[in-house]
C-alpha cells in the first residue's frame, strides 16, 4: 500500500470495546459494520455495531402527547419523564407537565389521550416547558419509544419554531432495544403494547396514551429488556441518534 491508500484504509477502520462488561475486548472493524449485528470473536457476545459507545450511565426515559402527528404543524401537550441510571429507575426523580398549545385540542386527541383543552388551560407554552425539561434532564441521554420517528422530531421542531438557542442531545429509540431482543416479530411490530405483552409486564395504574402511563410502562420495559440482553449500564451496542433541546 502507498501512503495515501494506507491513510484512507485507516480512516475506514474504527475501534470499539466489546459491550459485554465481562469482556471489554478491543475490537476493530470497518465503518460499514455500523448498524449490523456482530459477535465478539473472544466471548461470543452479540451486539449491534455502533460508533456510539459511551461511558455515561445517565438516561432520561420520556414520552410526549401531542395535538397530532406532524412536528411542523402540531405541538406537544404533555410530557413525562423519569431518570434511569446505572440500570435502575429513579422513580422519585420524575418530570411532568402539561403544555398549552396554540391550537385547540381536537375531540379525537382528547378521546385518544384523555387530555382536553380544560387540562391545559393555564399551563405554560410548549417552549417554556421544554426549557424546564432541558434544565432538568441535564446531559443525560434521552430514551423514547419510536423516538427517532416521532418524539425527537417534536423536540427539535419546538426549538426551531421558537428560535431557541439549542444543544445537541444523544437519544435512543427503545424500538431498537426491542428489535435486539425479539428480532423478527412476524408482522406484529414493536409497539409499546406488544413489548409490554411479550415481557409480561403488569398493567399500569395510569391511562395508556397519557405520558405518565406510557413512561411507567416504558421505564419497566427498558429495565427488563436491558437485563435480558445483558446490556451494560451505559447501554453500549444500542444505536443512537440526535435531537435538539434548548440551551439553558
What is each of the regions a protein language model found here?
Residues 13-18, 35:
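Flanking scaffold residues of small Cys/His-coordinated metal-binding clusters
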Residues 18-20, 40-43:
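Short cysteine-rich clusters marking metal-coordination/redox-active sites
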Residues 22-27, 47:
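Cys/His-rich microdomains that often coordinate metals
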Residues 29-38:
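Short linker/helix segments within small regulatory modules
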Residues 44-51:
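Short Cys/His-rich micro-motifs in 6-15 aa windows
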Residues 51-169, 189-209:
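Conserved non-catalytic scaffold segment of RNase H-like nuclease domains
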Residues 172-189:
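Short alpha-helix plus adjacent loop in nuclease-associated cores
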Residues 198, 219-248:
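Acidic two-metal-ion nuclease catalytic site recognized across multiple nuclease folds
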